[in-house]
């Protein structure tokens, strides 16, 4: 089945200050899309996107306190919402995008709470379209939802080299039946149940960058996606890189997945190749191609997507995006 998809939207980011140590920030992104070749009839439909057009809508609160000697205490709570209906996203959580407290120092950051895993940080600069409605998340829904509840994280950057790790005692306490709610709270007597861990090695410079990350989640009784036992694992290996030439960025990456819960085709490779071109200070054009293939199976998927973004100001932009799968 082939589909053509398009969306036109307006995104508004609204940072504001509560004081020297506290900030309220946010972004509202509303998109209307037209989808062709839907269902057995092959008809089309028009709808308003609920999760994202180009960037997911959110409102967040960030506070910090200087403790001296380069050490600061930080707290972040960030809520995701669907502006078309005014409902919470991330499985209905009140602060589902991020919710953590920690410390920041010259040696890096250490935090506890609901946070991004290292898979998210590994692809942030190489996956050109990112959380766009037509992007890597269309083929692997975990990628834009790479977060873990009950997580302990460390991340530090030293002369362009970033290292990081996460460990979650119970990766997902919500039973929404979506990638953001897979009913695996963990923290029981089984030491492996619903655990998550990830590790990151990343280098960035003005001319180029590369990243390597591993992300592994374990199952538990009642967990969704057939990960119903702590003996079952879902692992992803992310390798990518990018180069910058004048106003152009080119990027290539791979996410290899080994999913114990899939008896038919446990291994899959998701390749992506993208380009971002800053045509003018106010106009950016980006495009990306994706190829998902399963080992030992004829199942394949190819996605092509492009986007043009025009900035009306530092905080407001219009964009149009097109996808074909």
Sequence positions of predicted segments:
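N-terminal signal peptide c-region/cleavage motif recognized by signal peptidases
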Residues: 13-16, 21
């Amino acid at each position: 089945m082939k589909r053509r998809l398009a969306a036109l939207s307006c995104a508004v980011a609204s940072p504001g200050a509560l004081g020297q140590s506290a900030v309220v920030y946010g972004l509202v992104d509303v998109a209307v899309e037209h989808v062709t070749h839907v269902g057995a009839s092959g008809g089309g439909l028009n709808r308003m996107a609920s999760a994202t057009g180009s960037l997911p809508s959110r409102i967040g609160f960030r506070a910090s306190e200087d403790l001296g000697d380069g050490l600061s205490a930080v707290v972040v709570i960030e809520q995701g919402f669907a502006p078309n209906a005014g409902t919470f996203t991330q499985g209905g959580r009140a602060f589902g995008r991020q919710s953590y407290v920690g410390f920041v120092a010259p040696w890096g950051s250490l935090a506890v709470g609901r946070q991004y895993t290292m898979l998210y940080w590994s692809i942030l600069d190489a996956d050109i379209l990112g959380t766009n409605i037509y992007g890597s998340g269309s083929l692997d829904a975990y990628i834009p939802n790479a977060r873990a509840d009950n997580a302990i994280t460390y991340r530090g950057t030293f002369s362009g080299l970033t290292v990081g790790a996460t460990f979650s005692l119970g990766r997902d306490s919500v039973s929404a039946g979506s990638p953001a709610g897979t009913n695996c709270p963990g923290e029981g007597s089984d030491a492996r149940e619903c655990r998550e861990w990830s590790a990151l090695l990343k280098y960035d410079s003005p001319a180029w960058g590369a990243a390597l990350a591993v992300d592994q989640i374990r199952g538990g009784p009642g967990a969704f996606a057939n990960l119903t036992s702590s003996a079952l694992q879902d692992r992803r290996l992310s390798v990518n890189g990018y180069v910058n030439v004048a106003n152009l960025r080119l990027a290539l990456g791979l996410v290899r997945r080994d999913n114990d819960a899939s008896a038919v085709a446990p291994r899959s490779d998701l390749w992506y190749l993208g380009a971002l071109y800053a045509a003018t200070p106010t106009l950016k054009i980006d495009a990306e191609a994706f190829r998902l293939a399963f080992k030992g199976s004829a199942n394949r998927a190819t996605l092509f997507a492009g986007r043009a973004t025009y900035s009306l100001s530092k905080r407001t932009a219009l964009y149009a995006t097109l996808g074909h799968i």
